[in-house]
Every structure is written in structure tokens, then in C-alpha cells.
Amino acid sequence: MSFSVTLPDGSKKEFDKAVSVKEVASSIATSLGKAAVGAKVNGQVKPLDYEIDSDVEIAIITDKDEEGLDILRATAAFAFEAVAKKKYPELRLGQHVADEGGFYVDTDKKDQIKVTELPELEKAMEKLIKSGQPIEHVVMDKSELEEMFKDDPFKSDLLKKIDSDKVDAYKLGDFVDFGFDALLPNTGKIKHFKLLSVAGAYWLGKSSNPMLQRIFGTAFFKEAALKEDLKRRAEIKERDHRTIGRDLDLFFVDPKVGAGLPYWMPKGATIRRVVERYIIDREVADGYKHVYTPVLMNLDAYKTSGHWAHYRDDMFPPMDMGDGEMLELRPMNCPSHIQIYKHHIRSYRDLPLRVAELGMMHRYEKSGALSGLQRVREMTLNDGHTFVELDQVQSEFAKILKLIMDVYRDFDITDYYFRLSYRDPKNTDKYFANDEMWERSQKMLKGAMDDLGLDYVEAEGEAAFYGPKLDIQTKTALGNDETMSTIQLDFMLPERFGLTYVGKDGEEHRPVMVHRGIVGTMERFIAYLTEIYKGAFPTWLAPVQAEIIPVNNEAHGEYAEKVRQELAKRGFRVEVDDRNEKMGYKIRESQTQKVPYTLVLGDEEMKNGSVNVRRYGTDEEISKSLDDFINEIDADVKSYSREN
């Protein structure tokens, strides 16, 4: 027997008998043999003891590789399973996942594991790690595993998904589990780890399945990396809009009433209203006609648009109204704006026709994907569509992009890049079938960006089903890539809906439709702002811009109300805290609620017609006249908006 192993640099090593991954690594270099934690064999991750006896391509994995971290974290998950099963014999284990985010294990137990129990489980894992117990890789008959897990519905479910008679499994003493690509050869290799949190998760992500408990953790080869990761996670937790939304009473979601359906509390509604008014004013100033259109539409419109064929899985089921009428909750606003266009006969003099709306939409998101305001089932999109002549496309594109950049400047959004999103040429079935249209529109989009001299990346497979688009990708406060804005060229929908305009030649022509979103949905945008600002919104956005605290309600309450009225009539959002609480407590509460200005009013202030001002985040108190404070807060508001 003779075979060759091809290395990443193209070189080959010849062997005349079966060898393990570790032996291949050692044959390359003794140091590599010691550093190896696994390998990619023909693209698949394999453990160190995996045997090779034929021609293969191989890339050795060490602790320097991302796959090495995955192997480490999978081993940590396996070790957690072993100690958890020993501590709670009645515990049933579900699926386990290890990736760039760490690892998690789904568990089922009558009395759920409390987060306060995690340190005890960590100690058990540390003891197991110090013992350096061997982890044995075995290939077992599927039937043997089925018998072993016959009373475990979760493992039985997972085994049903395996179509091979042989299954890779791992043993640690009497404990056995399967579903791992590769694990380290003993527990002593796990090094630095942390159990992080617990959460609920439906089995296999389906809301019709039982709710299990998901235990999250992470692991690293180096202690410094673990410490840095934990620091990053603390920052993420501090910025999480769901936590801030709860603490500042901005919004809530009650799964019992409806998962993915947020309720906006007064403060959250105020922030949203300020953003919406800002957006509408900017768009109207830019020539857009703002409209309102119904959230329900005849299903035939979505069959014509192609949404029903290409987007059905993300739409709610249609409502049968009888007599053949089928109504659909709209997942997108474009067919509605097309009806606005079609309502009148259009001439070239009407173009560009810019239609905009804060349009409410509904999309069927799986319950497991829902998250705060970022992933919801009901959303309001800052949507707009421009109908143009062909020779107006590039100038309109530039105009829309300028509007987006102006908005970004006002909200201080600086961390972004441009992505041209094309269809996937290898999977054209999910797109509108017109090669000429795709080539033409992709070329026009690219040309518009090149004419503006802007850098961009190109991404195949990220286009909408009806046309290519420019996506503006922002970096969230939590470090995630997110599409904030889009500009999209569409030759398809005007054709499908028979849109026309009368040209200068008196003949009918087909307009081009430009879809655009400036800040996406209100829900996602406000989640983004909440995390960027950590809930400390700039004064122009803050739900309460000034909090007035009278030292004594009886003595100073009337003056406090006078100051409130004076500020309110100038358009500032101001409240009086006249609760029967200690003044120090009320001041701390104002700071906790991240109110930009706290005004304390006592005898001195009432006598002089002044206010004692404390800015959020400082301990400094400054006494000034009410007029001076009004000038200060007015300048502050204008410094964050286009008014200055």
C-alpha cells in the first residue's frame, strides 16, 4: 500500500502504511506534531487519531487556527456534558455547538440549572481538567447508539438525522456522546474556560418543540485571550439594547401576548417619534412625497410582484375573506407605492417621482431568531421608491447617497462601508429570471459607484430577488456587521405591474424603479442607537431632556412647575420629580435614567429665578439664571441636529 498526502503548499508526503493525523503532523516537523490539535482532511475537520490510508489533501490545525479554537470549545462542551450528567443523573442532553462565539449545550431537567450553580459546575470541570483524563474517539454502530439512547427523545432525534450506519462518538469514562467533528485527546488540554449564562431555547429552534435550557460557555488556549473575551462580553452586556430598554423603560416584548411584537413605552415612543419626524422632514426637504398605505393587500399583488414565489416563507399566511378574496399582511411596501404611481397617468415631467413612507410591515420570523428590537415580526420601515427615466438613474443614485450621508452625519454614524450586492450566478433560481436585466442593472450600479469615486466590496448572493443593490454596512456597538441603508435598481417590478410614462416623444416608456431605505426599520435603528449611546442619548434625542427636582414639594413645587412650563413652551421635553422621596435618591435616579440635565430647585433658586444644573455623567453643579440655562440647552439640542 502506498499513498500520498498533499499539504497546503502543494508538496506531498508519501506513506506506505496507514498513519494518523498526529503522525502526519510529526512527520512534517516534531514541533508541529506537538502543536497539532486536529486537521482538515479533504476539507473536513478530523481528530488527531483519525487514520489516513489513501490519497488526501491535509491541513494541520493548531491553536493558532480558528478551527483549533472550535476543537477546544467542542472539548470544553463535552467536558461540561460529562460533569453535568454526573452531577444531575436525570439530566438529558440535546445538541451542542462550538463556534467563534464560544459553545453551548442544550439541556433538559425538571428543576432547571440556575445561573448560581454554574460556579459549582466550573469547579467540577476544573477538577476533571486537572485529572487529564483521556477522551477516547470511537466509531460505533448507529444501532448501538440508538439502543443506548432509546429513552432519550433528544438524542434519538439527532440519531435519526444521521444516514450512516457508523457514527463517530467520544468516551470519557462511562460517559458517551456523539455529534462532534473532533475533540482534544484528553481533558488536560482544555486550559482556560468559563461558563457564561443560561437561557431558554426551543428544541431544534422550533416553537412547537419543548423548551430546553441552553448553557453557554467559552474556552481559549491562552488566559489573556479569555480575559479579553470576558471584558468584551461585559461591554456587550452593558450596551445590549434589550437590557437598556428594560432599565430605561423604553420598550418590552411579552411572548405571552406575541413574540416579536414590541410595545413602545412613553420614553421609547418619544425617541421613535423624534427620529420619525426628523426622517420625514429630511425626505420632504429632498423632494419626497410622504404617503400612508394599507398594511393589508390582495394576495394577487404579491403574486404579480414575485414575493409570493420567492419570499413566501417569510410572509404570514394569507387571510381568506370569502368570495375568493385573499388578503395578505405586507412584508414589503414596494407594491403599495407602485399603486400610488399607477393612480395617475404619468408624464416625463413627473419624473423623478419620489414616494416615501414610514410603512408598517409584517414578516414571519421564526421564534428562535427573534431578538429585542433587532429581529421582530412587526416593523416600520423608513422606505422610499423613486420612479425615474433611464438617463436619470445615476443622478438619482447620487442624490439618494448624499441624503444617506447627511443622515449619517447628523447621527454621528462613522463606522461603515459600501457593499454592492449581486445575484448568485451559480444559483439563479431564487432570482427574477432575466439575465439581460441583471447584467444591465449590476453594471449601472457599479458605474454609479465608480463615477462617485467610492470604494466598495462586491458580494455575490446578497441581492434581493428582483435586483442588485448597494448595501451600506455599519458596525454595531456590539461589533456585528449590519445593513443600515440600501439603494436598489429595479427593472422587474415596473415591467410586471405594467408601469408606464409618456415621454417627450409622446410614446409610452417604462420607468426604472429605485428602492431605498435610509435607516432601515425604526425598530432596528433605535436598537442600534441605544447600543451606540449606551442609553445616554444626545439631548436632541433624549426622551426627557431635563428633570426638575424641587428640594421641598410644598415650598418649591410652584416654582418647579413654572420652570417646567417655561421650558416646555420652548419645545423642550421636561418632567418634574415631585415624588415623596429623598432628594439624593431622586438625583441618583435622574442620573440612572441618563437624563441630560438635572435641575435642583431650592430657596436660593426660587429667590433668584435661577436653576442649579447638573449634567449627566458629572458631579459638578452650576447655578445659572433660567434664561442662561435655556440658551445652553437650546444650543446643545441644535449642536446635534441640522439646525446649527
Curated annotation (Swiss-Prot):
UniProt KW Translocase keyword: no
Cofactor note text: Binds 1 zinc ion per subunit.
The keyword Thylakoid is annotated on this UniProt entry: no
Keyword field: Aminoacyl-tRNA synthetase, ATP-binding, Cytoplasm, Ligase, Metal-binding, Nucleotide-binding, Protein biosynthesis, RNA-binding, tRNA-binding, Zinc
SMART domains cross-referenced by the UniProt entry: tRNA_SAD
Coiled-coil regions listed: none
Region Catalytic, annotated ranges: 240-538
Catalytic activity: tRNA(Thr) + L-threonine + ATP = L-threonyl-tRNA(Thr) + AMP + diphosphate + H(+)
Residues at which Zn(2+) binds: C334, H385, H515
Disulphide-bridged cysteine pairs: none
Cofactor(s) demanded: Zn(2+)
Primary location class: cytoplasm
Subcellular location: Cytoplasm
Any GO BP annotation: threonyl-tRNA aminoacylation
Domain of life: Bacteria
GO molecular function, one term: transferase activity
Pfam families named in the record: HGTP_anticodon, TGS, tRNA-synt_2b, tRNA_SAD
GO cellular component: cytoplasm
Assembly and binders: Homodimer.
NCBIfam families associated with the record: thrS (TIGR00418)
Described function: Catalyzes the attachment of threonine to tRNA(Thr) in a two-step reaction: L-threonine is first activated by ATP to form Thr-AMP and then transferred to the acceptor end of tRNA(Thr). Also edits incorrectly charged L-seryl-tRNA(Thr).
Family according to the record: Belongs to the class-II aminoacyl-tRNA synthetase family.
The name this protein goes by in its record: Threonine--tRNA ligase
Organism: Lactobacillus acidophilus (strain ATCC 700396 / NCK56 / N2 / NCFM)
